[in-house]
């Protein structure tokens, strides 16, 4: 009866809260106001190294055409560059594998600052979320241990029109 339902509801709520517990955001130490050598707000249309792969009106998504996708020197599955009204505002990186995940975490910490390693701060469970928050840029990484797949968003925080079209959902 009631006790069984209350216990089940409590178990569901507990699991939902702990399945994807994010780590606390840490300050982004070196905010480059962009991604690699491309400042936020830049037009990608004139840049030869990019090809448009999707066009959804005010949103356009590009990929680099003359090189394999890599974050630093780490090979990844894909890197996509999103513009909103022709202004560069987001990079989405997808990758697979626990070894790649560890290499990417090391790379991001060397570039943007160390994560808070206080016990309880780093996530446990099937979904791990890490966030670096700067003045111009936010870097958010989500890794699912069950599928060994990760996604990273590098996003402009200062682009006047926030990219709120739903493409920043962390789904694979």
Predicted segment positions?
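Non-cytosolic coordination micro-motifs
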Residues: 25-65, 92-172
């Amino acid at each position: 009866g009631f006790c069984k339902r209350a216990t089940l509801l409590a178990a569901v709520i507990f699991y939902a809260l702990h399945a994807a517990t994010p780590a606390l955001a840490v300050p982004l130490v070196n905010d480059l106001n962009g991604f690699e050598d491309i400042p936020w707000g830049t037009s990608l249309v004139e840049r030869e190294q990019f090809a448009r792969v999707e066009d959804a009106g005010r949103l356009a998504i590009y990929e680099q055409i003359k090189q394999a996708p890599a974050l630093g020197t780490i090979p990844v599955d894909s890197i996509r560059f999103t513009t909103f009204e022709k202004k560069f505002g987001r990079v989405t990186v997808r990758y697979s594998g626990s070894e790649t995940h560890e290499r990417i975490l090391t790379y991001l910490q060397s570039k943007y600052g160390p994560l808070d390693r206080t016990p309880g701060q780093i996530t446990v469970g099937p979904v791990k979320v890490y966030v670096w928050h700067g003045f111009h840029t936010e870097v958010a990484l989500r890794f699912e241990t069950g599928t060994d797949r990760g996604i990273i968003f590098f996003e402009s925080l200062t682009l006047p029109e926030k990219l709120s079209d739903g493409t920043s959902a962390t789904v694979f």
